[in-house]
Design a protein with these regions (language model features):
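A short alpha/beta connector and helix-capping loop motif
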Residues: 139-162, 434, 438, 443, ...
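Terminal amphipathic helices with adjacent charged low-complexity linkers/tails
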Residues: 280, 284-324
Length: 670
């Protein structure tokens, strides 16, 4: 406890001297944190800490030197290589999963981590602990994680460290009644323990009871520990702006660094001189470590892109470029997705499919009497029947938890394939995708990775979908570093790209256009169980000499129809059509080669025209291929509005064949 506090104090001094760049302390939380660390088995149990958990991770084995290396942002920082702020703990060896700044986002990931324990080691008694302040319990992910953990009796210990303040907002303005543990009364399977988190002895008893409950696989447990916060939230905050002198005096009186030494002396377990010698030794060691760490080298220039993706498995390489071995009759795109999932589940027991309505039937006793659901589009039909309910199961309607759970499972080495039912409903999971899943490898300096494949149905051209079943917006996700984004236009590509997504080691957003699921024109015989298509390799679906159309998804077929019309009018001027297939990364060489041949380019996509995916391609063509162009770069996209319900509205809003023809004729007239 004293070591944790002295590191806080030393960092505060360094920040005031401008020798480090940020500081947040765990002062006042030391007793409950050390108790939690003593109840766990380092390197066996798993921990999702938050930024105040300095004493917890120290008790698990993180060294003071590691902490100071992170504070100065050194290349030798074992948690992140200088990429994360201080107090963002990470240690693969100690099973301390890399943390992030968004409060509460760790909850749903811890559900997946604890779920993985039950799946990978059913006979083991390992547990997962997730920690937060009381303010984070206002986040939706907290409630989603509790719901999931209680439903499945997941061995997960929630540690809520309640110091009474979420920066400047007191508990009574965060939680109805001011007590999170009181609100949770009635959650089935959940053990609730409320404890004075500044009392080490009581804290140890509480943590031991909670951990033992989870080890016995009786369900999740929650410890609500009342702490104190004798320092400001961080050095960016001044608590005197919202705390009275009396508030601050009361908190100081409950400081565990005063209470615990006094208790040791009163119980005859130590004398004041012995305690002082220990504290003096800690102070001396802290000073020595600080002086040494301040000389540490910063991250190397040129290392910023390192570990953005896996550096051992490259899905853009020739290893992922195989030839099809066609089998059977032509199949629809949705059938190919279903078969590819089944083949990969058979090949690799780590592959697990879950989401809303993906299972055949949640009530297993009914499986012999019903046909089964298997997804609203039948993409997962039969997978539960073939592989069991542990490998294909339904979840609550909670998109953040679906993605976060998958992230936690992937950290443990599983290959989760969650489904988001409609692209229009992916937004509750946005923080989990952008701030967590996509940057886990980068922010942990390759310490952790999360190769999740998120399947999502996307797009319009199905009458009646309207605002919430017909939108696109893929450009939002192609703007996220570390995330692969794929969108096949036909059954054959869906098979090869989905298999690559599952076998690669990066997170992938796999976009499945709803209109293309059962079209007759994009069917293909099955390409075999080892057919792979590398990411970033486009397909020239039609060669031409006078105009290049760069497109993907549902616009591929519409581009073919437009080209047919144009070439009927002038057979000597033909249109080349490039299906990108993969949006991040994309095949720039294919675009460059085609544009240098045709000297004209039209970029077409279904999403809104303004700030759409085509804007980046058009800008790069204009920037790098200007000398090859005989006409401006043109774009076709949807109107800058929402997709309407009535078919006439939808047809007006979404790009049609006539829109492609009009722009193509304008370019060909130059």
């Amino acid at each position: 406890m004293h070591t944790s506090r002295r590191i806080d104090d030393r960092e505060i001094l360094l920040k005031r001297q401008s020798r480090i760049f940020f500081q947040v302390s765990g002062a006042g939380h030391e007793a409950i944190q050390v108790a939690a660390g003593m109840a766990l088995r380092p390197g066996f149990d798993w921990v999702y800490p938050y930024y105040r958990d300095r004493a917890l991770v120290l008790s698990l084995g993180v060294s003071p030197e590691d902490m100071f290396l992170q504070a100065v942002g050194a290349a030798a920082d074992r948690a992140s290589g200088g990429r994360q702020m201080p107090s963002h703990w990470s240690s693969p060896e100690l099973h301390i999963v890399t943390g992030s700044s968004p409060t509460g986002s760790q909850f749903v990931q811890s559900v997946g981590c604890a779920h993985a324990s039950s799946y990978l080691h059913p006979a083991s008694d390992e547990v997962t602990l997730v920690s937060s302040g009381e303010g984070a319990t206002s986040e939706g992910e907290f409630w989603e994680s509790l719901n999931a953990a209680c439903l499945d009796k997941i061995p997960l210990v929630f540690l809520v460290q309640d110091n009474g303040w979420a920066i400047s907002v007191p508990s009574e303005r965060q939680t109805p009644g001011g007590s999170i543990s009181a609100l949770l009364e009635g959650f089935p399977q959940l053990l609730r323990i409320e404890v004075d988190g500044t009392d080490f002895v009581a804290s140890y008893a509480a943590m031991r009871e909670a951990v033992d409950y989870c080890r016995a696989r009786r369900g999740p447990a929650l410890v609500h520990a009342h702490c104190t916060r004798p320092y400001s939230h961080s050095l960016s905050d001044d608590e005197r702006l919202y705390k009275t002198d009396m508030d601050r005096a009361r908190e100081a009186a409950r400081d565990p660094l005063l209470r615990y030494p006094a208790w040791l002396v009163s119980e005859g377990l130590a004398d004041e001189r012995a305690l002082q010698r220990i504290m003096d030794e800690v102070d001396r060691e802290t000073q020595e470590i600080t002086e040494r760490v301040l000389r540490a080298e910063p991250p190397e220039r040129g290392s910023a892109l390192k570990y953005l993706y896996s550096e051992t498995v490259d899905p853009t390489s020739s290893e992922f470029d195989t030839q099809p071995v066609f089998l059977g009759d032509p199949r629809t795109m949705v059938d190919e997705i279903n078969l590819t999932l089944a083949e990969e589940m058979k090949r690799d027991s780590r592959v697990i499919v879950f989401g809303e309505d993906v299972a055949d039937c949640s009530r297993e006793q009914n499986l012999l009497e019903v046909k089964g659901k298997g997804g609203v589009f039948k993409a997962t039909a039969g997978l539960q029947m073939k592989f069991g309910s542990k490998r294909c199961f339904n979840t609550p309607i909670a998109e953040a938890c679906i993605v976060g759970r998958a992230t936690g499972m992937a950290v443990r080495g599983l290959k989760p394939i969650p489904e988001i039912q409609f692209f229009d409903y992916i937004w509750p999971a946005m923080m989990q995708i952008r701030d967590e899943l996509a940057n886990i490898r980068w922010r942990s300096n390759n310490g952790f990775s999360a190769p999740v494949v998120i399947r999502v149905a996307i797009g319009g051209y199905l009458n009646g979908g309207a605002i919430y079943h017909s939108q696109c917006g893929e450009v939002v996700f192609t703007h996220i570093p570390g995330l692969r984004v794929v969108m096949p236009s036909n059954a054959l590509d869906a098979c090869g790209l989905l298999r690559t997504a599952i076998r690669c080691e990066d997170p992938v957003l796999f976009l499945e256009h709803k209109r293309l699921y059962r079209e007759p024109y994009n069917r293909s015989p099955h390409a075999g169980p080892d057919y792979l298509i590398p990411f970033g390799k486009a397909k020239v679906v039609k060669p031409g000499n006078a105009l290049t159309i760069v497109t993907y998804g549902a616009l591929v077929q519409k581009s073919l129809q437009a080209a047919m019309y144009l070439e009927q009018r002038d057979p000597n001027r033909t249109v080349e059509i490039i299906d990108l297939r993969c949006l991040s990364p994309y095949d720039w060489e294919a675009i460059r080669t085609s544009v240098e041949k045709t000297s004209r380019v039209l970029v077409a996509h279904e999403d809104c025209l303004s700030w759409g995916y085509g804007a980046e391609l058009a800008a790069r063509v204009a920037d790098e291929l200007f000398g090859s162009l005989d006409a401006p770069v043109a774009r076709v996209g949807a109107l800058d509005t929402w997709v309407g319900y009535h078919p006439q509205l939808e047809n007006e809003i979404l790009p049609q064949v006539d829109d492609l023809i009009k722009q193509a004729e304008r370019l060909l007239a130059y």
